């Protein structure tokens, strides 16, 4: 029975789509027949290419299936591309407060387009963009202005939901839009709880990954604590600058770590003031800490990152303001509240500015106390005095008042000037024996006098003649007050004289300044002088102008901006490579000079150190050993009875006030 279902009207059997066809094969050639090489070309009329032309009538319904197939293939390709992109994209960082990380929110193209910084207003086309749940766009305006934290979190949540919709499978048929809307609606209802739990992670990741994350942290600090972070700190530009006191604010900390931090930080610190507040990012920890050893910013950041498991870029680290009364009052008042954990002794800079007793102790600056400090520490250089006295501000009230004054440069200059006057007056009232004893008492430790004698013997210098010349030299006997050390280079002449000059506190004059009228001015303030490396021109100058100075008689010295000074020239040491006794030009200097020759090269050890050590301790031992031989004043009576003179004091006495 024929099956005519699905056909219209009567048709033959061959025209039916479901009928059977009879196919017969016609064999023109058999196996083994010879075939010409060009037979196919001659018989080919091109009729076999007719089947490649599609001459079907338009609208027969097959293009719908092809379009559907293309759409399905395109959808599958897009899903594969997104899968590859997600596979090779770096995993984002999640704050410890994030319970359920949302990968869809992090990898969503819409969330990635959100930036806190100002972007260009030019619209850009994104590659591989999938149409979302009925709101897909091919143009995305990347301009974003300043936004609040709450707006960014909301946008991140919405985009996370849309990203989740994009990751699901889609139907591209006629009902595709309805299925997408239904799938998107189901996703929102099912992910409402997870989006709410991920609000903290969205806020931290959206804000702390911004280009200007420090400004964001500063704004969040002011929102939480009610004041600016810069009002409590002073800025260190270098991360290598060390300080013992630091203010550290850490954002996004686990609640359990924030509580345990109060105990973990104690072994490292002498004082710690800890405040813990909660916010939508997690726990915020504000700490004022004084470490047992001074640390730089990098060391502090690494330590806090280890204790709190938070990246270093989630921290604000600066030293506190030490001379700000409002800042000190803030730390003092918050330490009394129940929101702070405090242990250790309160820093002195807080006590000084908050406790009434310490505030009353602040006094005006006294120049005499600064002069006394410079005199006691033998400081006559202005820069050294300013630095050393400023370091005493933490323990000395007068030094603190000095730092608070507006005339520091004037005070330093006046203090150094007065200290030099006192030192010069003290030196002028001493003879050479008292001066040597005074210089020796300042040197700590005992040395050995033998290296000095051994070095003189190494240079073939007779010790007894040298001792006699040194005795006359120290006593200032006329025509015996100048000792010359002559010899070739590298024999230790300058080393020997410089070590003796340092012990006696002498001065050095240089012939290079001889064109000035004031080049001899240092001799007016010293007990001994040194002219190093005298040349032939220098000897001619001495022979012409300084004969009476070598005699040890009274000379007149010109001083800058002062009147001429008449004084007895102090004993003078001279080193030279020219023998002044062998030249007839300087025959009048022969009776005024005591010459010792150093012919041997100065010996050194294998490490490059001097074989003979000539230091202050050895010279102290040398003078103590040969005190009587040098005919110096015998200090035995003073040692037995003690020093009757009182130490110099330029600070007026104070009466003790009873309470």
Curated annotation (Swiss-Prot):
ATP binds at residues 487-494. Its EC number is 5.6.2.4. One of its GO terms (cellular component) is host cell nucleus. Phosphorylated. Sumoylated. The gene is E1. There is a cross-link at residue 568 (Glycyl lysine isopeptide (Lys-Gly) (interchain with G-Cter in SUMO)). It catalyses: Couples ATP hydrolysis with the unwinding of duplex DNA by translocating in the 3'-5' direction; ATP + H2O = ADP + phosphate + H(+). Pfam families: PPV_E1_C, PPV_E1_DBD, PPV_E1_N. This is Replication protein E1. The lineage of its organism: Viruses, Monodnaviria, Shotokuvirae, Cossaviricota, Papovaviricetes.
């Amino acid at each position: 029975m024929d099956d005519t279902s699905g056909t219209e009207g009567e048709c033959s059997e061959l025209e039916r789509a479901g009928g059977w066809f009879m196919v017969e094969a016609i064999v023109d050639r058999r196996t083994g027949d010879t075939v010409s090489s060009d037979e196919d070309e001659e018989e080919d009329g091109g009729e076999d290419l007719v089947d490649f032309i599609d001459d079907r009538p338009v609208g027969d319904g097959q293009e719908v299936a092809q379009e559907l197939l293309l759409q399905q293939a395109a959808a599958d390709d897009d899903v594969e591309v997104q899968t590859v992109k997600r596979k090779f994209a770096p995993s984002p960082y999640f704050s410890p407060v994030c319970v359920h990380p949302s990968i869809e929110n992090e990898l969503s193209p819409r969330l990635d387009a959100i930036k806190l910084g100002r972007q260009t207003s030019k619209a850009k086309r994104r590659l591989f963009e999938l149409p979302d749940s009925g709101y897909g766009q091919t143009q995305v305006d990347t301009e974003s202005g300043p936004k609040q934290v709450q707006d960014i979190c909301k946008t991140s949540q919405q985009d996370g939901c849309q990203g989740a919709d994009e990751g699901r499978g889609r139907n591209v048929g006629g009902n595709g839009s309805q299925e997408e809307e239904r799938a998107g609606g189901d996703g929102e209802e099912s992910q409402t709880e997870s989006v709410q739990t991920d609000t903290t992670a969205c806020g931290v990741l959206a804000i702390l990954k911004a280009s200007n994350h420090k400004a964001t942290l500063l704004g969040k600090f002011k929102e939480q604590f009610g004041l600016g972070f810069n009002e409590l700190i002073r800025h260190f530009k270098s991360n290598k600058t060390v300080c013992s006191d630091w203010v550290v604010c850490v954002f996004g900390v686990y609640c359990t770590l924030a509580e345990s931090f109060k105990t973990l930080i104690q072994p490292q610190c002498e004082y710690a003031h800890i405040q813990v507040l909660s916010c939508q990012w997690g726990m915020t920890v504000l700490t004022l800490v004084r470490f047992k050893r001074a640390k730089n910013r990098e060391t502090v950041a690494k330590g806090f990152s280890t204790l709190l498991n938070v990246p270093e870029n989630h921290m604000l680290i600066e030293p506190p303001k030490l001379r700000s009364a409002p800042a000190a009052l803030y730390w003092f008042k918050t330490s009394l509240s129940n929101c702070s954990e405090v242990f250790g002794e309160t820093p002195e800079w807080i006590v000084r500015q908050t406790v009434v007793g310490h505030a009353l102790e602040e006094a005006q600056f006294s120049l005499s106390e600064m002069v006394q400090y410079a005199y006691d520490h033998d400081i006559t250089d202005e820069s050294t005095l300013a630095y050393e006295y400023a370091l005493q501000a933490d323990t000395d009230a007068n030094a603190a008042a000095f730092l608070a004054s507006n005339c520091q440069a004037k005070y330093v200059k006046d203090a150094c000037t007065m200290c030099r006057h006192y030192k010069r007056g003290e030196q002028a009232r001493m003879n050479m024996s008292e001066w040597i004893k005074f210089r020796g008492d300042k040197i700590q430790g005992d040395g050995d006098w033998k290296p000095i004698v051994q070095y003189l013997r190494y240079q073939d210098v007779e010790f007894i003649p040298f001792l006699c010349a040194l005795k006359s030299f120290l006593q200032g006997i006329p025509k015996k007050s100048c000792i010359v050390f002559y010899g070739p280079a590298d024999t230790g002449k300058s080393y020997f004289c410089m070590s003796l000059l340092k012990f006696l506190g002498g001065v050095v004059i240089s012939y290079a300044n001889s064109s000035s009228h004031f080049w001899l001015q240092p001799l007016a303030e010293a007990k001994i002088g040194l002219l190093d490396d005298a040349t032939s021109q220098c000897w001619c100058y001495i022979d012409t102008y300084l004969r009476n100075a070598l005699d040890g008689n009274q000379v007149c010295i010109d001083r800058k901006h002062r009147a001429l000074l008449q004084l007895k020239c102090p004993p003078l040491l001279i080193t030279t490579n020219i023998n002044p006794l062998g030249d007839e030009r300087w025959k009048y200097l022969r009776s005024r000079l005591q010459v010792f020759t150093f012919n041997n090269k100065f010996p050194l050890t294998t490490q490059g150190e001097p074989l003979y050590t000539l230091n202050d301790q050895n010279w102290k031992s040398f003078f103590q050993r040969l005190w009587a031989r040098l005919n110096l004043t015998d200090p035995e009576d003073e040692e037995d009875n003690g020093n009757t003179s009182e130490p110099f004091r330029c600070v007026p006495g104070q009466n003790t006030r009873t309470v």
